[in-house]
């Protein structure tokens, strides 16, 4: 069999179609497939002429009429996006320095963000009503939190052992020995630090407690006068003038899972009869060439399977500016003015058609709503860690989400996905300028969602949580280490966002959102410092003699005090704040029915196991988050390169590498405290033994086998597992289908396989006009690539080749026309197996 025959056999043609092609040489095959009979001055450009024919052979049902167009040089191009209609979207520079703003005001250059009234008088009255209610509620929350914190801090002060602060006179210490003064002050300095940290941490816990409590009451009563979901009855027809874009920004994601969830979502939309009101945009920032080719293939298959021509679009950016927020901004600039609303989806998002239609109805019923955030439910994971987290978010999450809505109303959170956004105000107000200055807290904003919500509210638009709208789903990280990688990014992003705390015009609620975002991670080093100071105080108490006389001529000694009854009362009160929300959550399930959670016994046992699991993980997260915060402030780059693994489980080697320092700290801490005072070790036991067990918990909890066993036992069961909605059933079905036909080593197949080469060539985006300089550069790229082995061709060079239709055509022609000359490429490709289901043959 000669090379031409092999080439023809690689195409998805019937025997009759193959027999009709010439067997003389590769160029003749391409010329025969070119119905326009174009003449190319270079023979290695001949594959460009057959692109259309090869695409129609492989994906005949994916190409809409007129979708294959000509670029400026007459090359075939697959039009994967609609025609752009550009809008202007530019950010205002941040003024984070209040002194600078004061100087601007003195010079008459201060610009106050304006509230543009878009509402009728009646709508303005309703708007003012809920804003007033929200303000009153938040003052009540502040009062409750501060009062609770003051009482708890006073109790804490009374139970600390050293009560002689008032007797210490700095003037009396001047003449005495320095060491004596130091030893007199040390326990009181430690106690003061402990007291301050306790107050901050207790205030943080108290705010969460009141949020959960109000959420419990909201869900128990079942009626919410100010719920945005109450503004519609749920069956109003959608306005055909207001179209919605479903946009999914992705970057090097699991292609099979992305397109399975997207297909299930789109089919659910079609089932509602509202598909004409929606379009889908897959916005790729992927820079792995293999994944890029797999995305293109999956997009073609998706269009064919759901008849999505003209409604499902795909774009891969070559210039990945500002990450996800920049990807969304690029969409808004090019196509945003074609839509009234857009729904942002994550790579793991799945939403029902009813939920999406409901979000659109809410937007139409509330003309001053800028963002409406759904409350996504976690599901779809099998590891013990993920199933435990799924259960926790499913059981406790509704309380906190409803509580957030109660306190915030239309000045709420936006989590960056599974939310609908009004496009016009987003374009006008939500472009993000880089933070000024230098260092780790300057540059492009990482956690864009909170900032976009704050800017939307600053412009006068509402930001709501539709906490009671069903049909929104997401997935969680499969194991602890994967979650911590995500937390590292979120930690840095939230610390950056705090620079916007004093930016002019921000609503107080969103200033509080920035503060709570920081405290989500800053609480970890504060807790660690609290434990460290408590340990240090115990060391001082055990190893030094107390200073009984703190003043000259003091008649009575100051005895260290220990009031165990108050300590136990304070400890019990703190535990109530921490664990009562969990108890309220399970009580709510007991009241409304436990069948979907496995029954009364199993859901209660699952709760107890989850509490134990959270106790084991809390100190581990504390230390990791402490490292993340310190690294961010010091400008260190936290490198986290995990070994490649075929499943979600954590290898023992990686576990000990990541948790080894925690295990060592736990051992040293436990031994030290046992030597000093066994009674103090009792109080520290949940901390130190969690650290000692951290590698083992990390590994065992990452195992799917353990997670699936708990599923068979109906532990950590959630309603989405007991009675899965159709959209999740479809996602699993399409995921299995996609796994069977998955495409690995996409770049090499795009070089060798005729069909995938045609697809890559047609979707390449670097379509420059011909020039001598460009031709020289192309030849250099191709020659350098072919003169090396494929293993030495790095990711960036592969991307350059993949982005240019001419280089892909020339690579394809040369490796087939001169296999002896480029034997290293041919031999490498022969070692790669093309999944026989990846390309359907006739």
Swiss-Prot record:
It is found in: Cell inner membrane. GO terms for cellular component: plasma membrane. One of its GO terms (biological process) is glucan biosynthetic process. The keyword 4Fe-4S does not apply. The chain crosses the membrane at residues 140-160, 194-214, 513-533, 570-590, 615-635, 656-676, 680-700. Its EC number is 2.4.1.-. It is an enzyme of class 2 (transferase). Involved in the biosynthesis of osmoregulated periplasmic glucans (OPGs). The keyword Transmembrane helix applies. It is a multi-pass membrane protein. This is Glucans biosynthesis glucosyltransferase H. Gene3D superfamilies: Spore Coat Polysaccharide Biosynthesis Protein SpsA, Chain A. Keywords: Cell inner membrane, Cell membrane, Glycosyltransferase, Membrane, Transferase, Transmembrane, Transmembrane helix. GO terms for molecular function: hexosyltransferase activity. Pathway: Glycan metabolism; osmoregulated periplasmic glucan (OPG) biosynthesis. Pfam families: Glycos_transf_2. Belongs to the glycosyltransferase 2 family. OpgH subfamily. It comes from the Bacteria. Coiled coil: none annotated.
């Amino acid at each position: 069999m000669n090379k031409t025959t092999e080439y023809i056999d690689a195409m998805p043609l019937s025997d009759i179609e193959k027999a009709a092609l010439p067997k003389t040489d590769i160029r003749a095959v391409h010329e025969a497939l070119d119905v326009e009979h174009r003449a190319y001055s270079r023979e290695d450009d001949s594959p460009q002429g057959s692109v259309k024919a090869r695409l129609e052979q492989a994906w005949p049902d994916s190409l809409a009429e007129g979708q294959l167009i000509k670029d400026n040089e007459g090359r075939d191009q697959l039009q994967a996006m609609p025609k752009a209609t550009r809008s202007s979207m530019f950010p205002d520079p941040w003024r984070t320095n209040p002194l600078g703003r004061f100087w601007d005001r003195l010079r008459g250059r201060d610009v106050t963000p304006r509230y543009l009234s878009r509402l009728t008088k009646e709508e303005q009255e309703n708007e003012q009503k809920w804003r007033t209610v929200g303000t009153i509620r938040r003052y009540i929350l502040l009062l409750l939190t501060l009062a609770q914190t003051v009482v708890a801090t006073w109790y804490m002060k009374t139970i600390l052992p050293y009560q002689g602060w008032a007797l210490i006179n700095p003037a009396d210490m001047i003449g005495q020995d320095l060491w004596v003064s130091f030893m007199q002050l040390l326990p009181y300095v430690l106690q003061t630090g402990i007291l301050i940290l306790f107050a901050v941490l207790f205030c943080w816990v108290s705010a969460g407690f009141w949020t959960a409590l109000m959420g419990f009451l909201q869900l128990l009563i079942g009626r919410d006068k100010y719920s945005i979901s109450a503004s519609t009855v749920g069956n109003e027809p959608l306005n055909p003038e207001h179209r919605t874009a479903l946009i999914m920004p992705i970057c090097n994601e699991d292609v099979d899972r992305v397109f399975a969830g997207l297909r299930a979502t789109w089919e659910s939309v079609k089932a509602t009869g509202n598909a004409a009101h929606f379009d889908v945009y897959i916005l790729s920032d992927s820079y792995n060439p293999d994944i890029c080719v797999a995305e293109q293939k999956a997009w073609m298959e998706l269009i064919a399977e759901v008849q999505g021509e003209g409604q499902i679009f795909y774009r891969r950016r070559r210039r990945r500016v500002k990450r996800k927020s920049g990807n969304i901004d690029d969409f808004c600039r090019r196509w945003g003015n074609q839509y009234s609303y857009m729904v942002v989806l994550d790579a793991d998002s799945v939403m029902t058609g009813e939920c999406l239609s409901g979000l659109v109805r809410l937007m139409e019923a509330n003309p001053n709503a800028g963002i409406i955030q759904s409350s996504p439910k976690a599901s779809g994971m099998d590891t013990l860690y993920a199933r435990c987290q799924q259960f926790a978010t499913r059981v406790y999450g509704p309380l906190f989400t409803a509580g957030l809505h109660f306190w915030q109303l239309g000045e709420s959170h936006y989590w960056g996905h599974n939310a609908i956004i009004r496009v016009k105000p987003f374009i006008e107000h939500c472009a993000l300028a880089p933070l000024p200055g230098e260092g780790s807290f300057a540059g492009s904003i990482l956690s864009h969602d909170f900032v976009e919500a704050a800017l939307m509210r600053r412009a006068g638009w509402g930001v709501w949580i539709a906490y009671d709208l069903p049909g929104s789903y997401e997935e969680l990280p499969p194991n602890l280490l994967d979650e911590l990688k995500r937390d590292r990014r979120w930690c840095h992003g939230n610390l950056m966002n705090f620079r916007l705390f004093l930016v002019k015009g921000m609503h107080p609620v969103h200033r509080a959102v920035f503060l709570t975002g920081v405290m989500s991670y800053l609480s970890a080093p504060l807790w660690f410092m609290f434990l460290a100071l408590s340990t240090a105080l115990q060391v001082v108490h055990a190893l030094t003699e107390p200073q009984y006389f703190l003043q000259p001529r003091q008649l009575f000694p100051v005895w260290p005090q220990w009031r165990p009854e108050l300590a136990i009362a304070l400890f019990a009160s703190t535990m109530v704040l921490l664990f009562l929300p969990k108890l309220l959550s399970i009580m709510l399930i007991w009241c409304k029915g436990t069948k979907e959670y496995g029954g009364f016994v199993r859901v209660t046992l699952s709760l107890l196991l989850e509490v134990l699991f959270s106790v084991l993980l809390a100190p581990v997260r504390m230390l990791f988050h402490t490292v993340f915060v310190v690294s961010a402030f010091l400008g260190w780059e936290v490198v986290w390169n995990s070994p490649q693994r075929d499943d979600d489980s954590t290898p023992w080697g990686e576990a000990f590498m990541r948790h080894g320092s925690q295990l060592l700290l736990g051992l040293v801490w436990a031994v030290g405290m046992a030597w000093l005072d066994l009674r103090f070790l009792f109080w520290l036991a949940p901390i130190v033994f969690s650290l000692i067990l951290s590698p083992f918990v990390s590994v065992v909890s990452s195992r799917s086998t353990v997670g699936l066993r708990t599923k068979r036992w109906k532990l950590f069961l959630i309603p989405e597992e007991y009675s899965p909605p159709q959209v999740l059933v479809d996602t699993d079905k399409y995921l299995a289908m996609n796994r069977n036909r998955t495409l690995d080593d996409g770049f090499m197949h795009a070089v060798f396989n005729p069909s995938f080469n045609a697809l890559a060539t047609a979707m390449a985006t670097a379509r420059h006009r011909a020039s001598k300089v460009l031709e020289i550069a192309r030849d250099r790229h191709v020659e350098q690539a072919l003169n090396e082995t494929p293993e030495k061709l790095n990711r960036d060079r592969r991307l350059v080749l993949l982005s240019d239709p001419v280089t892909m055509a020339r690579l394809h022609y040369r490796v087939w026309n001169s296999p002896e000359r480029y034997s290293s490429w041919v031999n490498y490709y022969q070692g790669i197996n093309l999944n026989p289901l990846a390309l359907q043959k006739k």
